[in-house]
A protein has these predicted regions:
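Positively charged n-region of N-terminal signal peptides that target proteins for export
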Residues: 1-4
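N-terminal signal peptide c-region/cleavage motif recognized by signal peptidases
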Residues: 13-15
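Hydrophobic small-molecule pocket/channel-lining residues, especially in calycin-type beta-barrels
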Residues: 18-172
Length: 172
């Protein structure tokens, strides 16, 4: 009887776990899909480090990518300094790829532009006339290794400065 229950549950769960194919507009970003674990990242403002992971999955029948993260922060001495959750939705809109980011600290960033090298990298940018300006870049360094960098131009300045960067490794 137990095996009938197990088989029934697996039959119900299997379609939900099946790989969703990205629609053509998002297909160049397929390299982002997966479960990623981070090495020690660098946090420029504090001189500390960060550690965490991301799950990036195809959603809405392949019409969107959803990134869900958790990040732990550490001070210069390596002691815990807090942490937060992050969510980002990546989607096509009128011929462009856009993204919406929110985190557990109350930040929201609207990425209105992207530069994509299919299967290799994507750089998201916030609106050019709104300050601060933000830029988020993912670059595939090798199969299963993804470099991430996040930078901003503060109000009254003209140059991007790093906020955080690190490397993610695909775990599944």
């Amino acid at each position: 009887m137990k095996w009938i229950v197990v088989v029934s549950v697996l039959a119900l769960v299997s379609p939900a776990m099946a790989q969703v194919t990205l629609k053509p507009a998002l297909a160049p970003l397929n390299f982002l899909v997966g479960n990623w674990k981070g090495d020690d990242g660098k946090v420029a403002d504090t001189g500390g480090t960060s550690k965490g992971g991301s799950v990036i999955s195809a959603q809405s029948d392949g019409n969107a990518l959803l990134r869900v993260d958790h990040t732990e922060l550490f001070d210069k001495a390596g002691k815990p300094a807090g942490g937060f959750h992050q969510t980002m939705l990546i989607y096509p809109d009128n011929g462009a790829i856009r993204a919406e980011y929110v985190d557990g600290e109350g930040h929201a960033i609207h990425y209105v532009a992207s530069e994509i090298v299919a299967g290799k990298s994507v750089t998201f940018s916030s609106p050019p006339k709104e300050f601060p300006l933000f830029r988020l870049r993912y670059e595939l360094q090798a199969p299963g290794t993804l470099a991430v960098s996040f930078s901003m131009v503060p109000p009254g300045q003209t140059e991007f400065r790093p906020i955080a960067d690190g490397t993610l490794h695909k775990s599944r």
